[in-house]
UniProtKB/Swiss-Prot annotation:
One of its GO terms (biological process) is defense response. It comes from Arabidopsis thaliana. Gene3D superfamilies: 3.30.530.20. This is MLP-like protein 34. Pfam families: Bet_v_1 (PF00407). SMART domains: Bet_v_1.
């Protein structure tokens, strides 16, 4: 009597989703910053936490909170493969809700640029073994992947639009003081800047944290365009080796005209001689087209730089 073959419990499901974002951008959402996926698709994915290792590296463990088939679920996954050239990443589910119905579950996401045009194709590949024949194939999970892909695409495109509306202004000021000394005025003792340039800056107070550390909050009183103004700023970056500091304006007069305003000051020693070059870089988004570009503020930065230079030389 012929043996009836048991139905195979091993299966594969795949689908493709056309997107407008680039292959590199989409891949980076899962490889470089999966903790941002919840921002793009909050109805489907609530969080992704790193449990072991580093984002996007083989062997690392990530933990997802997601909603599938109307239920809150979790998945602990190990990254099995990452191939940046192919925009490919593979996750193996090791714990969580899927393990109640499957002995093994592998998810591979590969993104390929579209031929002869912008955009890309996201290829989802699910490879699994069911614990019994009663378990359904994960077709609703594949549909979930399609929805997540479409929402990530929208998120990436809206981010691009935001980048387009951000503008920059920059200038350089040659000074005689050393790069370290000038940098230290803004990183180590910005409350001394008012001594150097009292007509422009009246005070700088520390509201939170420590001078020159990322996340700290400082509060400036200054005069610009003949008016007394204030600025509350958060320190976004400090790189002593590059003599660089970045401030993000979070409150004050500038916020009346700009949605965002970031100021970076970097000082580099002059090649083959004494002195340095102060590079001021403004990155901003105006609230509307009527708002002027902050050219007078750039001129203010030049004046402040020159007066700080004189102050530092007098101290020597």
């Amino acid at each position: 009597m012929a043996k009836t073959e048991a139905p195979s419990l091993v299966g594969k499901l795949e689908t493709e989703v056309e997107i407008k974002a680039s292959a590199g951008q989409f891949h980076h959402m899962f490889a470089g910053k999966p903790h941002h996926v919840s921002k793009a698709s909050p109805g489907n994915i609530q969080s992704c936490d790193l449990h072991e290792g580093d984002w996007g590296t083989v062997g690392s463990i990530v933990f997802w909170n997601y909603v599938h088939d109307g239920e809150a679920k979790v998945a602990k996954e190990r990254i099995e493969a990452v191939e940046p050239e192919k925009n490919l990443i593979t996750f193996r589910v090791i714990e969580g809700d899927l393990m109640k119905e499957y002995k093994s579950f592998l998810i591979t996401i590969q993104v390929t640029p579209k031929h002869g045009g912008p955009g890309s194709i996201v290829h989802w590949h699910l490879e699994y073994e069911k614990i019994s024949d009663e378990v359904a194939h994960p077709e609703t999970l594949l549909q979930f992947c399609v929805e997540v892909s479409q929402e990530i695409d929208e998120h990436l495109l809206s981010e691009e639009e935001e980048v387009k509306t951000t503008e920059t202004l920059e200038t350089e000021v040659e000074i005689k003081a050393s790069a370290e000394k000038f940098h230290h005025m803004f990183a180590g003792k910005p409350h001394h800047v008012s001594k150097a340039t009292p007509g422009n800056i009246q005070s700088c107070d520390l509201h939170e944290g420590d001078w020159g550390t990322v996340g700290s909050i400082v509060f400036w009183n200054y005069v610009h365009d003949g008016e007394a103004k204030v600025a509350k700023e958060r320190i976004e970056a400090v790189d002593p080796e590059k003599n660089l500091i970045t401030f993000r304006v979070i409150e004050g007069d500038l916020m009346k005209e700009y949605k965002s305003f970031v100021i970076t000051i970097q000082v580099t020693p002059k090649h083959g001689g004494s002195g340095s070059v102060v590079h001021w870089h403004f990155e901003y988004e105006k609230i509307n087209e009527e708002v002027a570009h902050p050219e007078t503020l750039l001129q203010f930065a030049v004046e402040v730089s020159k007066e700080i230079d004189e102050h530092l030389l007098a101290e020597e």
